[in-house]
């Protein structure tokens, strides 16, 4: 299914398949990608297991390579890319990001007001984001020179209880902030 939202389009499909992107994008190239791939940490959401979140490192790398390669084919030469990820899988994400043809420009940190409940020694009140662009291109930057790599936005309170069903829902102001820096 493809939904049109003004000039934008959203598809529900398999990001590892080129035909998903071909159906969504046609000949149009994206100016920005902001994605939240599975974190590969075996989490559950309100409706059960998150698809592909239980993959091992090798399978996770192969999954990301397919997705990132498909994304690159449909991104403008001067586009930017934001990828949210889990710190415990940093190497998998960075390796796939770079091997698929992207340059890492920065690691950004979204500082959350509180840590979600997790059965870990350290509670993560932050979420890392890879910021980058195509190695064969450049990127646009519209932010000033005062932007820091750590920023704080309120999370979505009780997102799972309110029916969002995602253990780490992203607040709209956070996404709007990221978009405004590059488009």
Roles of regions detected by a PLM:
Residues 1-183:
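Core catalytic lobe of class I
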């Amino acid at each position: 299914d493809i939904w049109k939202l003004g000039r934008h389009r959203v598809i529900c499909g398999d990001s590892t398949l080129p035909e998903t992107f071909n159906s969504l994008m046609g000949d149009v190239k994206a100016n920005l990608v902001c994605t939240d791939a599975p974190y590969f940490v075996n989490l559950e959401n309100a409706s059960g297991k998150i698809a592909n979140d239980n993959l091992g490192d090798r399978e996770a790398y192969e999954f990301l390579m397919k997705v990132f390669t498909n994304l690159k084919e449909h991104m403008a030469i001067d586009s930017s890319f934001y990828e949210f990820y889990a710190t415990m899988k940093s190497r998998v994400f960075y390796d796939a990001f770079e091997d698929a043809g992207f340059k890492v420009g920065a690691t950004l940190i979204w500082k959350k007001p509180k840590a979600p409940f997790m059965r870990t020694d350290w509670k993560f009140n932050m979420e890392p984001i890879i910021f980058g662009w195509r190695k064969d291109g450049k990127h646009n930057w519209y932010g000033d020179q005062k932007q820091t790599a750590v920023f704080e936005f309120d999370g979505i309170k009780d997102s799972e209880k309110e029916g969002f069903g995602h253990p780490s829902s992203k607040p709209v102001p956070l996404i709007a902030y990221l978009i405004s820096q590059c488009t």
